[in-house]
Amino acid sequence: MFSMTQRSVRLFSTLVFMALLALAGCQSVPPKGLTPKQIAVLKQEGFELTDEGWAFGLSGKVLFGSDVETLNQASTEIVQRIGKALLSVDIQKVRVDGHTDASGKEPYNVQLSVRRAKSVVKVLTQVGMREENIQLRGLGSSEPVASNSTAAGRTENRRVSIVVIAD
């Protein structure tokens, strides 16, 4: 039989063990995501927070002509500026999403959207981003931001978005 002292010691030991287990489960996890400085730069450059991350291009700043896959000079300068700004705050991983309007057949539009995304990736690598840190997607006409029934809407849909994912 256990004496009262032995029971107290055993109970105390059990409580200490349970407290240590609870504390081990409460260890803080290193912070993930973006720093306030990185978020400030993203906002300054015109990125908007979306369900998929911080996206640039929703307001139609990197647009393409109909059936065109190369960036014009103004869009090239925008992508260069963005790439340099991201690197200046140690954002090194992005996703580049190419888009088209709904004109033409979808298999062709997907290929065209990939080529558009590649043209942006090329500029980003020229300013110092590593190609292996850039995910590329060609989405064709699957994610329009405007109606394809008007010329203005189709113009808005011929675009590339740059997305920063905080992980």
Locate each region found by the language model:
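Short, flexible coil/turn micro-motifs enriched in small/turn-prone residues
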Residues: 20, 48, 55, 93, ...
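Extracytoplasmic/periplasmic, Sec-exported soluble proteins
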Residues: 30, 67-78, 88, 104, ...
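Periplasmic peptidoglycan-binding/anchoring modules of Gram-negative envelope and division proteins
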Residues: 38-43, 48-49, 63-97, 125, ...
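N-terminal targeting leaders that direct proteins to extracytoplasmic destinations
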Residues: 1-53, 69-70, 77
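Short, small-residue-rich loop/turn micro-motifs
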Residues: 58-62, 90, 98-100, 138-140
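Core alpha-helical elements of the protein kinase catalytic domain
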Residues: 24, 84, 121-122
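Periplasmic OmpA-like peptidoglycan-binding domain that tethers envelope proteins to the cell wall
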Residues: 99-167
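Envelope-exposed proteins and targeting segments
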Residues: 43, 52-54, 58-60, 67, ...
